[in-house]
Amino acid sequence: MEPTTQTEPMAVTPKHELENGAAVAANNEEHPSKKQRLESVSITEQEVSDGAPKRMKGVAPIKAEFLVQKSARSQPVEESVVSLSADDAAEAAHYQEREGEQKGKKRASGQNKGRDFGRSEDAKGLCPSRAFSPEFSPKECKFGEKCRFEHDVRTYLKEHKREDLTTFGGICPIWDAKGRCPYGFKCRLVRSHMTERDTSDGRKELILLEDEERKKTARPVVPYASEDGLVNIVSNEDKIAVARRKTTTPRSDAYLTWLDKTSKALEKNLHGRHLEEGGADKGAGAQTKDQVEENRAAYVEPPFLPSEKRRIYFGPETPALAPLTTQGNLPFRRLCIDHGCQFTYSEMAMGMSLIQGQKSEWALMKAHESEALPPTISSTADVVQGYDNSKDLKFGAQIAGNKPWHAIKATELLGRLTPNLRVIDLNCGCPIDQVFREGAGSALLDHPSKLEKMLRGMNAVSEMIPITVKIRTGTRDNSPNATKLIERLVLGGHESSMLNIGPPGVAAITLHGRSRQQRYTKSADWSYIAECAALIKRLNEKKDDVTDTVREPDERMLPNGGKVFFLGNGDCYSHHDYDDHINNAGVDAVMVGRGAIIKPWVFEEIQAGQYLDKSATERLAMVEKYAKYGLDTWGSDEHGVGTTRRFMLEWLSFTYRYVPIGLLEYLPPHIQDRPPAWRGRNELETLLGSPNYKDWIKITEMFLGPAHKDFKFEPKHKSNAYEPQG
């Protein structure tokens, strides 16, 4: 990254300005001297070039006073290896661990695959007929004496349920926020919303409490949200109907029939032209033209053309959170929204699994009502004509598939069952071997014709929901093909020009500046992203420059009034990176992935335009908020607490890699840098930076209490299980 010697005028967004050679930190109330200390002590890259000690590539430049002897926090495996395996897992963790993954590969050395998380359950569960009813007036249990659950509430509380948590002030965070707890007597903080009342016969009856004032305050802010503040909830009846193929997909069926017929005709047509040896036979040429006209006549326009779909907007003030498997769960997305993230995506869902009605896959579509609110955009934003911010929302779905019918049918089902989606994004960047071998994810980069068919079909059946796509530079380092692919996605390929059906109609393209082969071994190539951004700008603004006028796109097939938005993705770790990419790469917005997992307040930094040196106390407060959001999502009963703990530990396996700004010798920080052994400014900061998973468990116990005796957690990499000596 080039040093900045003075404040440069912003060509795109005056709001995001690069620093004038000085490190900037937040002036937090807890540490009023932080900003002054960072400005006076930290060395910028400009000062390095003026004679200060050089910054070592790949090593986090920690100040000498915070370094410790290697033996104190040594790790048997290089930190970079740990990070690479974890970063790959963030893209498709549970697909990576499916059966069929090849074993014994050298690059998998040190990884814990097929991890076992144990279980967190009551010794004996409470019957659902008793869980929410007053002690002496329960609902009738349809299993009667054969029921395997406990029917006596007091016996359950005394003998089968672990003691209540003492965290959160002893008050259930769900009840505190909503005035009611949907987990009843099974809640691990039930004593905060349970009491005894005297009955007419002199007995003491246990009852659950509700707070009407809290319930009024907690009413959903989005009209179509559930009582719990969630959107895109698919009922069990709908999922069963999908699984049993009782839910029809008429638009997909019609499109796929046309696609099959057209593909065969085109194949025959193109094959015949090759045999003509230069096309000397005019009769054959005329016949080919007639066939093309027949194909055009047979094409039935979809009910919603790309130009008629809901308009969207991406801009410098709308940073997006990348789709993240495992890490991109609902509690984490809520946390990012709280810190200024404007767009979120579901975890990657497999199209075939959605078609089969798998509950786990449909559960990925759930979103919090905060994600269903319109994004905050600038009053001077250059929005496309027809864009209505009040109808926009923040949450989109991402799917993957290896066959056109997988993606197309899944899209129609999503549009029908989960209509509260900003976009449906097709994943063409997942590098995981299992996904790649099946022909999905980044494998589609080498099959542009198939990819175009998938996107065109998705557009034909998604109704008002726009279609977007996320790609990589290519599958191999030495042969990037994103420029050719982008041109095809914006203008349409040769087949579409023969049929005169225009481009596939994607509303936005996101490019991750790495190849599939590269993974995270090198930094993202933002110069290539800039090249692609310039190409899209030319295609958006100067359609007349397209030399092949036959391929000039049909305006009816163009989304967003003819503009295809372009987002860059890769290694954004601070507002400095974000501003640099906006101003120098020419992207409309930046999608943040690993940077947000490691420090969710990166969105806050982007909004403020300065570094924020969050104290250990502030960072721990984020962990507490995550715990509350986790209990709200997965439950405050024993099982929910265990699930929250598991996903919190997965998140902490990334957050420990954050080195506080105040400890760095040079700025800006680089996400690829790996730190030597270091200690924090206090014990809590040191604990938050520990690479030992047992310390991560200690952090979860601050809010979730001691782990269940049957709970297990294996870190993604064996080195994180290493116990430091001394």
UniProtKB/Swiss-Prot annotation:
Alphabetical keyword list: Cytoplasm, Flavoprotein, FMN, Metal-binding, mRNA processing, NAD, NADP, Nucleus, Oxidoreductase, Repeat, tRNA processing, Zinc, Zinc-finger
Region of interest: Disordered: 24-56, 68-124
Gene Ontology molecular-function annotations: flavin adenine dinucleotide binding; mRNA dihydrouridine synthase activity; RNA binding; tRNA-dihydrouridine47 synthase activity; zinc ion binding
Catalyses which reaction(s): 5,6-dihydrouridine(47) in tRNA + NAD(+) = uridine(47) in tRNA + NADH + H(+); 5,6-dihydrouridine(47) in tRNA + NADP(+) = uridine(47) in tRNA + NADPH + H(+); a 5,6-dihydrouridine in mRNA + NAD(+) = a uridine in mRNA + NADH + H(+); a 5,6-dihydrouridine in mRNA + NADP(+) = a uridine in mRNA + NADPH + H(+)
Gene3D superfamilies from the UniProt entry: Aldolase class I (3.20.20.70), Zinc finger, CCCH-type (4.10.1000.10)
Family annotation (InterPro entries): Aldolase_TIM, DUS-like_FMN-bd, tRNA_hU_synthase_CS, Znf_CCCH
Listed EC numbers: 1.3.1.89, 1.3.1.-
Family of the protein in this entry: Belongs to the Dus family. Dus3 subfamily.
Protein name (Swiss-Prot/TrEMBL): tRNA-dihydrouridine(47) synthase [NAD(P)(+)]
Source species: Neosartorya fischeri (strain ATCC 1020 / DSM 3700 / CBS 544.65 / FGSC A1164 / JCM 1740 / NRRL 181 / WB 181) (Aspergillus fischerianus)
Lineage: Eukaryota, Fungi, Dikarya, Ascomycota, Pezizomycotina
Gene of this entry: dus3
